[in-house]
Design a protein with these regions (language model features):
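Glycine/serine-rich anion-binding loops at beta->alpha junctions
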Residues: 92-121, 139, 254-269
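Short, basic/glycine-rich phosphate-binding loops at helix/coil junctions
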Residues: 50-65, 113, 135, 216-227
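Conserved protein kinase catalytic domain
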Residues: 15, 33, 73, 114, ...
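Conserved, helical-rich catalytic subdomain that frames metal- and/or nucleotide-binding sites
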Residues: 144-146, 151-255, 270-283, 288-306
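Contiguous, small/hydrophobic- and glycine-enriched helical/loop subdomains that border
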Residues: 88, 110, 114-151, 155
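ATP-binding N-lobe of GHMP and related small-molecule kinases
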Residues: 1-101, 118-131, 165, 174-178
């Protein structure tokens, strides 16, 4: 039996703008993704038993759900069909990233499963096709094939890699008793419906692709500091998350913000020692001291798998 172990890193959004609701029921986004060192681990091994088995450690709720609903299972199943690979597979998912925290754990697991499965079977797949499969699993999944820092546009699924930033120390605080549904958070945001002419202007086509990319990258160059359009509506319904942000700033964070649609909140600290010291002030919550992680680690994973 062959076995592959692969990390699945979490992400934070350094900026997240909700431009409006599109005609296809999705929202038009502009966001800057950044991977952080907090991660889950996947172990994939070939098996003589037919089918795909998935065992989840570290998250009891996820382990009780039908395996076929899990993004890891769906990712491997899609790739198995694409490559027409026979034979069974055993997957172990060791969870550390809090579920439902806005840290991209499920999407990262799916991307890691795609890369790990390719490596396990020593297969290659055109990167464009791999992206298509990733998009079919979720809007955030393609980002985790790149890692580092990237601009996400459209639904967040069209990506433009950005230059990596210097390493920053991060403290993630995840409340144990607050869970935010992403669809609910979008409803709370009450984004305006984009007019059809606006939708056409925001949609990339062969005719406007170069201009569209230029405008998107100009947007990323203009923004500065942390910003998240989910904060106001989510904080209104969960005031404790606003308190966590305030407490992070009081504990020495230079900046703090809601992670994605929540419910985790993160702070940027001058050093790991200060982040660890601040973590002591959140005894009832899950805390993770980590750091931003460059694209290089992802680059090694992609080059090995493809």
């Amino acid at each position: 039996m062959r076995e592959v172990r692969i990390p699945a890193f979490a992400k934070i959004n350094l900026r997240l703008d909700i431009l409006g609701k599109r005609g296809d029921r999705y929202h038009e986004l502009r966001t800057i993704f950044q991977t952080i060192s907090l991660h889950d681990e996947l172990r994939l091994r070939t098996s003589r038993n037919p089918g795909i088995s998935l065992t989840i450690h570290g998250n009891e709720a996820l382990s009780r759900e039908p395996a076929s609903r899990n993004l890891v299972y769906r990712a491997v199943d899609a790739l198995k069909r694409e490559l027409k690979i026979r034979g069974g597979l055993e997957i172990e998912l060791h969870k550390t990233i809090p579920a439902g925290g806005g840290l991209g754990g499920g999407s990262s697991n799916a991307a890691a499963a795609l890369l790990g499965y390719l490596r396990l079977h020593r297969k290659r797949l055109a990167f464009e096709r791999l992206i298509e499969i990733a998009v079919s699993l979720g809007a955030d999944v393609p980002f985790f094939l790149f890692g580092g820092r990237a601009l996400g546009v459209n639904k967040g699924d069209e990506l433009y890699p950005l230059a990596d930033i210097p390493k920053h120390s991060i403290l993630v605080v995840a409340p144990r008793n607050i869970h935010v549904s992403t669809p609910e958070a979008f409803r709370w945001a009450q984004a305006p419906l984009l007019a059809s002419v606006q939708s056409r202007q925001l949609t990339k086509s062969p005719d406007n692709s170069k201009l569209w990319k230029f405008c998107a990258l100009c947007w990323s160059a203009q923004v500065g500091g942390l910003s998240n359009d989910f904060e106001r509506p989510v904080f209104r319904r969960h005031p404790r998350l606003a308190t966590l942000k305030r407490d992070l700033l009081r504990a020495g964070a230079t900046e703090a913000m809601l992670a994605g649609s929540g419910s985790a909140v993160f702070g940027v600290f001058p050093s790991p020692a200060l982040a660890r010291r601040a973590a002591v002030g959140f005894p009832s919550d899950q805390t993770f001291v980590c750091e931003t992680i460059s694209r290089e680690r992802y680059k090694r994973l992609v080059q090995t798998a493809l």
